[in-house]
Amino acid sequence: MKDAEDALPARIPIFPLSGVLLLPDAKLPLNIFEPRYLDMVRDAMAGDRVIGMIQPRPKTSPGLARSPSLLAEVEKPAVYGIGGAGRITAFEETKDNRFEITLTGLSRFAIIEELAVTTRYRQVMADWDRFAGDRWAEEEATGVDRSRLLTALRAYLELARIPAEWETIAKAETSSLITSLAMICPFGPSEKQALLEAHDLFERSRIMTALVEMSLLHRASGGGEDDDDDGDHRIH
């Protein structure tokens, strides 16, 4: 990932997907079935294979009338200014004409501007300079309180009834563990965005620990399941 062949393009397609983030070196499997994103993957495969994952911003309170502006927001939602880009490193076309792909994280990016395009999918000009360290430096886990994080995580997963392979977790490098948890744990979009935008591994670990501990307090006080936890999750 650190070689010159991984130079990143100024113009990239974006795939808005709530609750999903892609961090450098991480693997993100995706099931592509919507026509515009099938187009996006075909075009990416014919080019540099780079796709930018980005979250839609939380919707404003909907009005009673479905105005043209609201309809446009559904079709083309406002997105956060920062996302994570990856390169397609695995591709398979299924018998029912879906694409099953894997993105390997390259770098975060900031949107300079969204382009007026004729493609059905959206494209942006990306600024990579702000996150140059994503590509050229190996992050160290200096200062990370791994013990505190894992203690809170174990209680959180048991309470949420999320299975975890603790033997694998115990052996994982701290940097890989934090990256995996940030991507897999069922936090809400704003919390996921905070994890994505964290300056470094230490800051991301502090945010992760705080989120897990706050969720524990919420559940322990009778708050029940988190509103955004509506999927099947496994930590490994």
Write out the residue ranges for each language-model feature.
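Positively charged
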Residues: M1-E165, S190, L201-R204, A210-H236
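Core structural elements
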Residues: I169-F187
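Non-catalytic, well-ordered alpha-helical scaffold segments
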Residues: S147, S175-T179, R206
